[in-house]
């Protein structure tokens, strides 16, 4: 059978090369020639089709690319923002590019974001875009593995746990974790023998974010487990949260095998916690008899509209989703905030003065941080976090799958509009993916003065785009409470519409308290030049070789003992 197949292949090669100078060459030479020429032929045909075959008039223009299937993947992957800005200059705010066989239509600007985030669920869905990435990590029966109406109910349940009452408890817990980390971590212990230390701030923030999140949202069992097996489970599960699994899911990779094993073990870990708490009756409220103010305590109490309580599996997988989604984004944002402040040490001193003015105890010292003051009385600290998110939104691209042809409003793009056809517009075909990139608007020089500069004070000036970005927002209840639908804003670091991040307030609280605690204890500056962004992971991180900052304790800093 093999011999017959080889003979047929050789015969075919002989026919192909019969009229060429390679007619008398060996089969191996002919085979190699074919392997070289076929890709070249594919490139030629791909280029010819783009030059000779016109794109339908009502379809967005397609970004020119040489290699079929791969398309613009390399160009986009190296620097998405450079890709977006250059394509906008050439094609406008709406254009399509090929990404590893998928057709991605990009809609830029505030109106483009509004199109993506507020399109009807019957036309575009997030679950069809992301479930193959998230479900193996989060688990079944939650988030994008369930119908959208169920997911909206689950978001409502999580929102219950993100209450002001819980936030009041979380502030001192976060402070305690930060101070304990500085006391016990080996890198900081070097301060006992020298005046300054150099710290990889991304590594430190990755550790602090999970420590503070586990102490507050995740619960005491998770916090205790961070020093044991849970930390390894998290690492293995996290290894499956990679771009390759978004593009080509379920490859037989060692990292995916580890991911799947870790998901089962972590799921069982949480299910055991839920079972023990329910057995002990520790599920009455956020201030129940066990004194728990974490998310598990809140979820145990919740019921769907049909009266069914959440199962242990659902709670376990919602907790995993909460852990994984918040860890990456907050680690990145807090790291960028520290690095941006390190590039402007004078702002660190302004933050310290703000702490002295707001938290003075009247005797030359500082009161402990509290929720009410953090929420209402530290405008510069809030502005630092907002400005960091403006320049460094964690996600550079947000996608939806187009289920049915989607009309682009004429106000966004009208390639065929005439006096006789004033309403003509692009139509994004079914089967495309539609992509928003809010970060483009957030650094657009047509919107922001000195758009590439880190200037928290822009948020304190009532006349700037920054100060006005939150005004006049429409609100809608998608099933988990009233939220802003204001996707027309040029500032959308947490998204908009039905899939807007519900952890926004906790993120501001967590990052703000960590920053304030460090500002009270340290001054810092960059160890080298400001790092470039690294676009190779799921969120935009600072490049590994530029994360070092130099910390110097304040002479008047609080004692950590």
Swiss-Prot record:
Q: What is its EC number?
A: 1.14.14.154
Q: Which InterPro entries match?
A: CYP450_sterol_14alpha_dmase, Cyt_P450, Cyt_P450_CS, Cyt_P450_E_grp-IV, Cyt_P450_sf
Keyword Membrane among UniProt keywords: yes
- One GO cellular component term: cortical endoplasmic reticulum
Which cofactor names does the annotation list? heme
Which top-rank group of organisms is this from?
Eukaryota
Task: Tell me where in or outside the cell this protein is found.
Answer: Membrane
One Pfam family linked to the record: p450
Molecular function (Gene Ontology), one example: heme binding
Q: Which residues cross the membrane?
A: none
Detail which positions bind heme.
Answer: 501
Describe which pathway this protein belongs to, using the record's wording.
Answer: Steroid biosynthesis; zymosterol biosynthesis; zymosterol from lanosterol: step 1/6
The chemistry this enzyme catalyses reads: a 14alpha-methyl steroid + 3 reduced [NADPH--hemoprotein reductase] + 3 O2 = a Delta(14) steroid + formate + 3 oxidized [NADPH--hemoprotein reductase] + 4 H2O + 4 H(+); a 14alpha-methyl steroid + reduced [NADPH--hemoprotein reductase] + O2 = a 14alpha-hydroxymethyl steroid + oxidized [NADPH--hemoprotein reductase] + H2O + H(+); a 14alpha-hydroxymethyl steroid + reduced [NADPH--hemoprotein reductase] + O2 = a 14alpha-formyl steroid + oxidized [NADPH--hemoprotein reductase] + 2 H2O + H(+); a 14alpha-formyl steroid + reduced [NADPH--hemoprotein reductase] + O2 = a Delta(14) steroid + formate + oxidized [NADPH--hemoprotein reductase] + H2O + 2 H(+)
Task: State any GO BP term from the record.
Answer: ergosterol biosynthetic process
Which keywords describe this protein according to UniProt?
A: Heme, Iron, Lipid biosynthesis, Lipid metabolism, Membrane, Metal-binding, Monooxygenase, Oxidoreductase, Steroid biosynthesis, Steroid metabolism, Sterol biosynthesis, Sterol metabolism
What role does it play? Sterol 14alpha-demethylase that plays a critical role in the third module of ergosterol biosynthesis pathway, being ergosterol the major sterol component in fungal membranes that participates in a variety of functions. The third module or late pathway involves the ergosterol synthesis itself through consecutive reactions that mainly occur in the endoplasmic reticulum (ER) membrane. In filamentous fungi, during the initial step of this module, lanosterol (lanosta-8,24-dien-3beta-ol) can be metabolized to eburicol.
The Swiss-Prot or TrEMBL record describes its family as follows: Belongs to the cytochrome P450 family.
Q: What is this protein called?
A: Lanosterol 14-alpha demethylase
Organism, by scientific name, is Mycosarcoma maydis
Q: Provide the gene name from the record.
A: ERG11
């Amino acid at each position: 059978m093999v011999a017959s197949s080889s003979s047929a292949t050789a015969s075919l090669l002989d026919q192909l090369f019969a009229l060429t100078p390679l007619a008398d060459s060996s089969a191996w030479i002919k085979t190699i020639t074919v392997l070289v020429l076929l890709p070249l032929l594919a490139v030629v045909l791909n280029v010819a089709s783009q030059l000779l075959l016109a794109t339908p008039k009502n379809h967005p223009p397609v970004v020119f690319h040489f290699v079929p299937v791969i398309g613009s993947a390399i160009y986009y992957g190296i620097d998405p923002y450079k890709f977006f800005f250059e394509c906008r200059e050439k094609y406008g705010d709406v254009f399509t590019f090929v990404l590893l066989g998928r057709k991605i239509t990009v809609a830029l600007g505030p109106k483009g974001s509004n199109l993506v985030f507020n399109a009807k669920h019957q036309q575009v869905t997030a679950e069809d875009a992301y479930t193959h990435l998230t479900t193996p990590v989060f688990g079944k029966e939650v988030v994008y593995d369930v119908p959208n109406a169920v997911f909206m109910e689950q978001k409502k349940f999580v929102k219950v746990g993100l209450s002001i009452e819980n936030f009041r408890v979380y502030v001192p817990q976060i402070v305690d974790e930060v101070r304990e980390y500085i006391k016990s971590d080996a890198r900081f212990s070097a301060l006992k023998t020298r005046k300054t230390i150099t710290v990889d701030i991304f590594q430190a923030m990755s550790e602090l974010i999970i420590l503070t999140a586990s102490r507050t949202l995740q619960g005491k069992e998770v916090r205790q487990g961070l020093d044991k097996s849970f930390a390894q489970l998290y690492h293995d599960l996290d290894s499956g949260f990679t771009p390759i699994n978004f593009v080509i899911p379920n490859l037989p990779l060692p990292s995916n095998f580890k991911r799947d094993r870790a998901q089962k073990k972590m799921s069982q870990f949480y299910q055991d916690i839920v079972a023990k708490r329910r057995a002990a009756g520790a599920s009455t409220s956020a201030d129940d008899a066990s004194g728990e103010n974490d998310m598990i305590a809140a979820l145990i109490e919740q019921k769907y509209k049909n009266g069914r309580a959440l199962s242990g599996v659902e709670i376990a997988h919602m907790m995993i989703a909460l852990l994984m989604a918040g860890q990456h984004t907050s680690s990145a944002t807090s790291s960028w905030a520290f690095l941006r402040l390190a590039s402007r040490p004078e702002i660190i001193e302004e933050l310290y003065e703000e702490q002295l003015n707001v938290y003075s105890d009247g005797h030359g010292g500082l009161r402990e941080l509290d929720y009410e003051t953090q929420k209402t009385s530290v405008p510069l600290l809030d502005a630092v976090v907002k400005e960091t998110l403006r320049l460094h939104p964690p996600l550079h691209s947000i996608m939806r799958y187009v289920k049915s042809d989607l009309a682009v409003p004429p106000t966004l793009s009208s390639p065929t509009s005439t006096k006789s056809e004033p309403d003509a517009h692009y139509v994004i075909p079914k089967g495309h993916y539609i992509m928003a990139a809010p970060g483009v608007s957030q650094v657009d020089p047509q919107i922001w003065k000195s758009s590439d500069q880190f200037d928290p004070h822009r948020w304190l000036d009532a006349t700037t785009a920054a100060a006005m970005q939150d005004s006049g927002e429409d609100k809608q209840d998608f099933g988990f409470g009233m939220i802003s639908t204001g996707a027309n804003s040029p500032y959308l670091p947490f998204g908009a519409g039905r899939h807007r991040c519900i952890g926004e307030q906790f993120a501001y609280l967590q990052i703000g308290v960590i920053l304030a605690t460090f500002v009270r204890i340290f001054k810092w500056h960059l160890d080298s030049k400001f790092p470039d962004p690294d676009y190779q992971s799921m969120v935009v991180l600072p490049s590994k070789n530029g994360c070092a900052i130099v910390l110097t304790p304040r002479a008047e800093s609080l004692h950590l003992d």
